[in-house]
Design a protein with these regions (language model features):
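Carbohydrate-active catalytic/glycan-binding domains of CAZyme proteins
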Residues: 1-460
Length: 460
């Protein structure tokens, strides 16, 4: 659970887990649940209501055959999918950790499957529900909006729109209708999400639709983007066509917390494999702003979080003058190897892994040239020109990030810069990596404090 402190998390018991074929607390048998898949959360008083997807084995398939980890990426497999709800009446009561790690949180009340009226457009196997409160003059009595994927067959899917007055009974309006100017990719969509935001330029309220598609040649495995406009019924009127939201190697399937200022985080890596060293990493949470129909992403509070909670995270931020030349940032590990290079020029920013694998994002004219490089564990996140452009990449390294080397060449200048390091990195830079060195340093500090108090030395 997200803490009140920026980028901090409270450890909690699992909220919802598969039932392993056991009856629920009321003694009702539901059949063996194979997986629980994420969906959406909406605030309810002091608590929250959860929308999630339960999978069961289809037909004669066994639970083992229907587990998501054993099914090729992007395929339905021998599974059925059902959207259910759960309620956490009071979030603060759910922060206690029980002694038995195998049990779900007893404060969570599973409410069962939602009811779906699909008489106007039949659907089945709905997944990835995104639920928000959304006013639509065409449906004044149904103030809740859901968009979800309807799995058509083993590999195809369609985004559909549903409305509800009470979050339990839902009516399918039909498939999401987007005009040609939306410029969506023709491939199968993944993980649609929607939020409503106010554009800072026009003060107009806009709906922002996030969709992920398979990547093409020279792109990452999956490419996430957004479309801006207004949704009424199932028709989406577009004001900003599909725009890639992150140009790095590995950002995909973003989740968005619908709030006054929406917060987004994404998966780092399309699908875990044995070739990778990390799995199921998340990007840093990003505060979203809509300005002139374009999204800006900001890691507010990240320097404080790095100093307070992290051992190996590192942030470097700078204001640049790159009308000519380039600014290059080499990321080195503790063996001195350059494991990533970030390059910033007047019209592009790029990330290169191990000197050979590059992703590049175009830059528009901006009021100022700024660059932020955020490193934590295996993840490198780059924010350019105030968050107008981002690149997120996993860095394949067998050792920890140690330092950065910054160069301005060809007439480029670094006007100002700031860096923040995690606790272990600061100890490394101070030569205090061993317990003996740390004890000696603390002893010297105590002696110095005593001498100052005794008047032997002046504090200045």
């Amino acid at each position: 659970m997200a803490s009140e402190a920026t980028y901090d998390w409270d450890i909690c018991d699992d909220v919802v887990v598969p039932n392993r074929g056991l009856a629920d607390r009321e003694g009702t048998a539901r059949g063996e649940e194979v997986d629980i898949l994420a969906g959406a959360t909406v605030p309810v008083g002091l608590g929250a209501e959860l929308f999630f997807v339960v999978t069961h084995a289809a037909g004669e398939a066994t639970a083992a055959e229907a587990r998501g980890a054993d099914i090729p990426h992007g395929q339905r497999g021998p599974r059925t999918f059902t959207i259910e709800r759960a309620l956490i009446p009071n979030l603060m009561e759910a922060t206690e950790v029980s002694d038995d790690p195998s049990l779900p949180d007893p404060h969570v009340q599973r409410l069962g499957a939602i009811d779906i009226d699909d008489s106007s457009h039949p659907v089945e196997n709905l997944v990835t529900p995104s639920v928000i409160r959304h006013e639509d003059p065409a449906h004044p009595d149904e103030g809740w909006l859901m968009i979800a994927l309807s799995l058509i067959n083993d590999v195809d899917a369609q985004i559909v729109v549903l409305r509800s007055s009470d979050r339990q009974h839902w009516r399918v309006l039909g498939p999401l209708e987007l005009p040609a100017e939306a410029a969506l990719r023709p491939d199968r969509p993944f993980a649609p999400r929607i939020v409503s935001m106010v554009d800072a330029d026009s003060s107009a309220r806009r709906d922002v639709l996030f969709v992920t598609f398979p990547g093409g040649a020279g792109e990452s495995d999956e490419v996430a983007g957004y479309v801006v406009g207004n949704l009424s019924g199932s028709a989406f009127k577009v004001t900003t066509p599909f725009t890639v939201i992150d140009f790095g190697h590995d950002f995909t399937r973003p989740r968005v917390i619908d709030y006054h200022t929406p917060v987004m985080f994404g998966l780092v890596g399309a699908h875990p494999s044995l070739d990778g060293q990390w799995a199921n990493c998340l990007s840093a949470p990003r505060y979203l702003s809509l300005v002139g129909g374009e999204l800006y992403q900001d890691v507010v509070g990240a320097p404080t979080a790095v100093r307070t909670f992290s051992d190996y995270a590192f942030i470097w931020s700078a204001q640049l003058d790159a009308q000519q030349g380039s600014v290059d940032v080499d990321v080195t590990d503790d063996s001195g190897q350059v494991i990533a290079t970030i390059s910033y020029t007047n019209d592009a920013v790029s990330v290169t892994r191990l000197g050979v694998d590059t992703r590049t994002a175009p830059l528009k004219d901006a009021d100022s040239d700024t660059l932020t490089v955020f490193l934590d564990g295996p993840v490198c996140e780059v924010f350019a020109d105030g968050g107008a452009v981002t690149l997120t990449s996993a860095i394949p390294a067998h050792s920890q990030i140690s330092d950065i080397d910054v160069r301005a060449t060809g007439g480029a200048k670094i006007i100002s810069s700031m860096q923040t390091a995690g606790r272990h990195l600061m100890r490394m830079q101070a030569g205090l990596t061993s317990p003996e060195d740390q004890e000696a340093y603390m002893a010297e500090a105590l002696i110095a404090d005593r001498d100052v108090a005794a008047g032997i030395f002046d504090e200045d």
